[in-house]
Amino acid sequence: MGKDTIANIITYIRNADMNKKGMVQLPFTNITEKIVKILLREGFVENIRKHRENNKYFLVLTLRYRRNRKESSKNFLNLKRISTPGLRIYYNYQQIPRILGGMGIVILSTSRGIMTDREARLEKIGGEVLCYIW
């Protein structure tokens, strides 16, 4: 049984969000860094910083919460892993689904790198569907 780094990222973020923790520490990989930068650009994450501890690198994320007068509510509604190591899911640019009518995002791994569904449609390229976030 191998490692699924993308599922681990999703699980770390989902668990921290459910426990209302403001910060998450993820192991650093190139894929992790690219996915987290997409989350920052789309507004799901407030801040990212690279942290070194015992010759190992980590990404420290600050999650974004909406501020209410009574209590702060979470911003992440749902994260779902689609393509797994045992079952890869590929779409061309016309088949890429729109999540909640465009309010959510699909993260794809394409021949030009990891990108969102909007970027893939603009460049007219498809790829492996990594996860849905809405």
Curated annotation (Swiss-Prot):
| Record family assignment | Belongs to the universal ribosomal protein uS8 family.
Query: InterPro entries, per this entry?
Result: Ribosomal_uS8, Ribosomal_uS8_CS, Ribosomal_uS8_sf
Lineage, top-rank taxon, reads: Eukaryota
Q: How does it assemble?
A: Part of the 30S ribosomal subunit.
Note the Pfam families from the entry.
Ribosomal_S8 (PF00410)
Q: Where in the cell is it found?
A: Plastid, Chloroplast
What is the recorded function of this protein according to its Swiss-Prot or TrEMBL entry?
One of the primary rRNA binding proteins, it binds directly to 16S rRNA central domain where it helps coordinate assembly of the platform of the 30S subunit.
Please list the GO terms describing molecular function: rRNA binding; structural constituent of ribosome
Recorded protein name is Small ribosomal subunit protein uS8c
Which Gene Ontology biological process is one annotated for this entry? translation
Q: Which organism is it from?
A: Phaseolus angularis (Azuki bean)
Q: Which GO terms describe its cellular component?
A: chloroplast; ribonucleoprotein complex; ribosome
